[in-house]
From Swiss-Prot:
InterPro entries: GAF-like_dom_sf, HrcA, HrcA_C, WH-like_DNA-bd_sf, WH_DNA-bd_sf
Keywords: Repressor, Stress response, Transcription, Transcription regulation
Pfam families: HrcA
Family statement: Belongs to the HrcA family.
Name of this chain's protein: Heat-inducible transcription repressor HrcA
Gene encoding the protein: hrcA
HAMAP family: HrcA
UniProt KW Transcription regulation keyword: yes
Summary of the function given for this chain in its UniProt record: Negative regulator of class I heat shock genes (grpE-dnaK-dnaJ and groELS operons). Prevents heat-shock induction of these operons.
GO biological process, one term: negative regulation of DNA-templated transcription
Molecular-function annotations in GO: DNA binding
Length: 331
């Protein structure tokens, strides 16, 4: 990621903080006055223009100030995130007391999701720890003569190979079928064969039968139970006043809440911003997640979900705090 000049870093950070607090576009004069930037309004305005050219700020209306773009939030999270405040330290102390009052894991996770939502104002999810079976991440299809080589790629990057008879006259379907399975896995972590396009039926059904025999090798996100709290907090955010944005979120919550939290290499501690998330229903959201482990090798996830306009430093520290606490309790 490109390293910004110091002035642009200050302006981007101030713009993010202003927008998180006010939900209003901001101009250079307000930034100077509110954040005490040691620069003139003209200098700050020039820096804002440079950030807009780099795609880190956007102007929602011609006469308005500027707000962070998804790329701007990403740069902020990766390079400019401040240390969390004292409130997170108080949360750690509170969790220590809370841990003395739980009898069953479900009860504990329910209390923790409620506390996370109360602390951050965001929707919280905690998945129950699952055995470390691998998840299917991708399928690669290679036609050779009358055979079809199938490479199953797990989220651990390990592979398993199948060799199928290629149905007669279906070789032209292979590339499109691979793209379709990729889309399915990226969106929900599983394949909905009921939505297989008619033009891919011949080759697709052969692949479906082969994968059915391998289903014990991988686990599906839909098998993972999740405790959820604060859905009403999420849909009450101004960003989701449009029902067309809320409906996909609620549908996903009803069908497969664990899909809010992608799994795989490098996702043990991660922030998804907008369209980075593999599920299109979350293209207007940010998801902060951190994994925890129990004493039997099972892995669960702690996550917060909200609009891209969120207090990332506090939210990320809170998620990490709860995950760390669960690691300690369950190890």
């Amino acid at each position: 990621m490109e390293l910004l000049p110091r002035r642009q870093q200050e302006v981007l950070q101030a713009t993010v903080h202003h927008y998180v607090d006010t939900i209003e576009p901001v101009g250079s004069k307000t930034l100077v006055q509110r954040f005490g930037l040691q620069a003139s309004s003209a200098t700050v305005r020039s820096a804002m223009g440079a950030l807009e050219q780099k795609g880190l700020l956007v102007q929602p209306h011609p006469s308005a100030g500027r707000i962070p773009s998804p790329r701007g939030y990403r740069h902020y999270v990766d390079c400019l995130l401040p240390k969390p405040g004292a409130a997170v330290h108080h949360l750690e102390q509170e969790l220590t007391q809370l841990s003395l009052r739980w009898a069953a894991l479900d009860d504990l996770l329910q209390q923790l999701t409620r506390r996370l939502t109360d602390f951050t104002g965001l929707m919280s999810l905690i998945t129950l720890p699952q055995p470390s079976e691998q998840r299917l991440h991708a399928i690669r299809l290679v036609p050779t003569d009358e055979r079809l080589l199938v490479m199953l790629v797990a989220d651990s990057s390990q592979t398993h190979h199948l060799n199928l008879r290629l149905p007669h006259g279906s070789v032209h379907q292979v590339a499109a079928l691979e793209r379709w399975t990729d889309d399915q896995l990226h969106q929900s972590g599983q394949i909905s064969w009921e939505s297989l396009p008619q033009q891919l039926q011949t080759c697709g059904q052969a692949l479906r039968e082969a994968l059915h025999n391998e289903e014990g090798r991988f686990i599906s996100p839909s098998d993972q139970s999740a405790h959820v709290h604060g859905v009403s907090r999420l849909v009450a955010q101004p960003e989701f006043s449009d029902s067309t944005k809320v409906a996909p979120l609620l549908d996903l919550m009803d069908c497969n809440p664990a899909a809010f939290i992608p799994s795989g290499p490098g996702h043990d501690d991660w922030v998804w911003i907008g369209g980075e998330h593999p599920h299109t229903a979350l293209s207007d959201c940010s998801v902060i997640q951190s994994s925890y482990r129990d004493g039997q090798g099972g892995v669960g996830q702690v996550a917060l979900v909200g609009p891209m306009r969120m207090a990332y430093a506090t939210a990320r520290a809170a998620v990490q705090c709860v995950a760390k606490h669960l690691n300690h309790l369950l190890s």
